[in-house]
Amino acid sequence: MIKIYGMKTCPDCSYIYDQIKDKGNEYEYIEIGDHVKNLKEFLIARDNNPIFTDCKANGSVGIPYFVLEDGKISLNPEDAGLKSRIWI
């Protein structure tokens, strides 16, 4: 199962959530704003994984982020079999 960390108020996260909401056991969406436990899990990953270096340098949050089935962390929806939001 692929874990996805995000927030309802994030447009990119909402786009991802819409893709997975009916996919059953393939994905687990973790809303980091729902509980401090979820936020702490996200912050531990963000503070300790170099994949977030550019996000932090640019003032970006770093969501949605994906924990793939092999444990790899990614910020790329395509790595999780999903589509990225297209900016117009």
Regions picked out by a protein language model, each given a short descriptive name:
Residues 1-32:
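Local sequence-structure signature of Cys/Sec-based thiol-disulfide redox active-site neighborhoods
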Residues 43-73:
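Short, structured active-site "lid" loops
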Residues 10, 35, 74:
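Surface-exposed, flexible loop/turn segments at secondary-structure boundaries
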Residues 18-20, 44, 80-82:
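Short, glycine/charged-enriched secondary-structure capping and boundary segments
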Residues 67-88:
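Non-catalytic, surface beta->alpha helical segment in thiol-disulfide oxidoreductase systems
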Residues 26-48:
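Thiol-based oxidoreductase modules, predominantly thioredoxin-like and allied folds used
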Residues 14-16, 39, 76-78:
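Short glycine-/acidic-enriched loop or helix-start segments at secondary-structure transitions
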Residues 23-24, 46-51, 85-86:
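Short, low-complexity, polar/charged sequence segments that are solvent-exposed and flexible
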